[in-house]
Every structure is written in structure tokens, then in C-alpha cells.
Amino acid sequence: MKFFIDTANINEIKEANELGVLAGVTTNPSLVAKEGVDFHERIREICNVVEGPVSAEVISLEADKMIEEGKELAKIAPNVVVKVPMTTEGLKAVKAFSDLGIRTNVTLVFSAVQALLAARAGATYVSPFLGRLDDIGHNGMDLIRQIAEIFAIHGIETEIIAASVRHSVHVTDAALNGAHIATIPANVIASLVKHPLTDQGIEKFLADWEKTQEK
């Protein structure tokens, strides 16, 4: 499973990229709005930092306008992936983008059949939302597993991005249940590195070393 970071903050992206594990970036209008910067310029900045796919979301809800927006986004850099909501109009846009050779990430997926529809329309990626399903008492991992099984049975190459990741257990379970990618906020990425026993081990090694230097 690959790691993407879910942010529009350049510093967070640069820090994650230095870890050597970052394979891509996902953004959304809310994340860019928090940064208070021009949307297209920020996507350009991100693409200059990261070589992997960078998802940039359309704002329009009508297919023709999504297509116009997506074409402009795709011009920013070759690694831009146009992010499209899972709607009837979104599927129309995904088909058009697929015909144009523009990669897409279908977002706000909450059922296996939505993922299948998106894949058949030509989506490069589908993004099931784990945390939001958990919030309403559903098991997001069941959805990841269902999508992975359906894609495997039918030889579908669309990749599954586990989104709305809240904690390290989500990351582990997504990997176990067949997600190709997990897109993760910066604070969760930081938490993945840490374990209390690792910290204790380092402290013990240092203490033991200091004792040898006192002799």
C-alpha cells in the first residue's frame, strides 16, 4: 500500500516528502481554503514538490462545467489528477476525462456499487471515506474489502484510495483489506512513526551508553 498525504499545506507536504515514503497528494476545496491562497497556484506549487499524483478537485456540479474545470487543472502539471464527486454528473465527467486521457479520482464514495460505477466510467482512483462511515455506525473497512474483492473478481485496475483516515488503526486495516493507497493527514502520518516502546528503547540505549562513558 502506498502513502499519500491529505493536505494543501506546502510545509506539511515537504516534511512528509523528506520521509521518503510519500507517493502522492490529495487536496480538496476546504483544505485549499484553509491556506488562503490561489487554488491553481497552490496546486502548481505542490506539483513542483511531489512527483507523484496530485488530486485537485473540481468545484462545479454540472458535467460540462466539471470538464471545463478539469481540463484547466490538467494543464497545470502532468501529475495532476482531477478529483470528481461521486454523482451522476460526476460519472459523465469521468467518462469524458477518460476519453481525453485525463486521470481522475472519484471522491465521496460510500458504497461498493458507487466504486464499481466509477471504475466502469473510467476512474483512475476511487476514494471510499472510512472515518465518515465510522461516524454513522458503519464499518469503513467492510467497504474497502468489498471494493477490493469486486475489483479483483472483475479484473478492474482502478486503484482504491482509503480516505477520511483518522488514526493508525485505519491505516493498518486499510492495508490488510486491500486498499492500494491511504491518503493521510499530516498529524496521522506523524503518529505512524511513533510507538512508546520505541521511545523507551531509545532512552534505555542512551542511558546504557552514558554508563559506559562514565567508566
UniProtKB/Swiss-Prot annotation:
Subcellular location: Cytoplasm
Gene3D superfamilies: Aldolase class I
Classification via Pfam families: TAL_FSA
GO molecular function terms attached to this record: aldehyde-lyase activity; transaldolase activity
Enzyme Commission code: 2.2.1.2
Active site per the UniProt annotation: K83
Gene Ontology CC annotation, any one: cytoplasm
NCBIfam families registered for this protein in UniProt: fsa_talC_mipB
Similarity comment text for this entry: Belongs to the transaldolase family. Type 3B subfamily.
Record-given protein name: Probable transaldolase 1
Organism for this UniProt entry: Bacillus cereus (strain ATCC 14579 / DSM 31 / CCUG 7414 / JCM 2152 / NBRC 15305 / NCIMB 9373 / NCTC 2599 / NRRL B-3711)
Name of encoding gene: tal1
